[in-house]
């Protein structure tokens, strides 16, 4: 696997020099300063590429070129945004970048209720608490028809949870859910957030699928001509939330997506933390079935809790994800590609990491502190080396 690291650009508290010392060789990056929908010019791409390469690193994956909300709802200027997206892909390809991670989640990218969940060892992790989320949706946001998303027991627990919240607790939970997290390009007030949700009224799962297929079919001629791989990131959490449809959550969704858009350039990001939050997702089987479409991997683990819809982010080799067999299957796919003449390694980044040690005293991007990811990368690197020496001849 190619060892990569997500970097948020010049304003990231983790520098390119730090990343080199972590042992990563590839950078996962995006031009966050360009507004959603606008074209990434070759000039801007080359400036960022030179900045990365000057440190002896490679811009391996774009994560991500954001998909404008009007593309997802297929309203307003959606065709203009698609045309701009196509031009951005052309420009990336001409600048030598061939892998783009993106998502098709409405409104929010990834969602957590707690950004500072304390682990037994004192480190801090990200957490999704189903009851806290229900309290937000039912009693803070007060989304119409939200009751239908929760059982009677969950509604009762959410009411107790809400009744025990202070104003500061409410503000913190609200901020955690609706403020733009790393990777989400937008932040919303409560009123703006509800207005964004309202834009999806009447958009069912089938309708969102239709819009995604239209979008990808527009892109594929450019991707096919330039060998540019689109790697969709799964929904996080991998289920409908806030009344919004989710369409990249299970192996059935991948089956559908690859059947509807059969181009080999239509691929996936295997995010083990996102897919792994569902107990019915067999990650190892997903890799076996769709390994030829995996162009990027995010390796992390989650631990589901007593309420199986609640989870926290575990250490990379702990939790519910069978990281041993996940890495084994990725290495088998790399071996298959190598035998077929494709020598490029699959880019892998240690996704998220616990805030620990000296980082506990620093301002960090939630999930993206340096030391926790350094630990995760080292653990996965060691696992990979052991598997290669034991089972692989090349």
UniProtKB/Swiss-Prot annotation:
Enzyme's top EC category: lyase
An MF annotation (GO) of this entry: mannonate dehydratase activity
Catalytic reaction(s) noted: D-mannonate = 2-dehydro-3-deoxy-D-gluconate + H2O
Keyword Iron: yes
GO biological process, one term: D-glucuronate catabolic process
Keyword field contains Secreted: no
EC number of this enzyme: 4.2.1.8
Pathway linked to the protein: Carbohydrate metabolism; pentose and glucuronate interconversion
Keywords on record: Iron, Lyase, Manganese
SUPFAM superfamilies: Xylose isomerase-like
Cofactor(s) needed by this chain: Fe(2+); Mn(2+)
Free-text function comment from the UniProt entry: Catalyzes the dehydration of D-mannonate.
Family that this chain belongs to: Belongs to the mannonate dehydratase family.
NCBIfam families noted in UniProt: PRK03906.1, uxuA
Protein name, UniProt field: Mannonate dehydratase
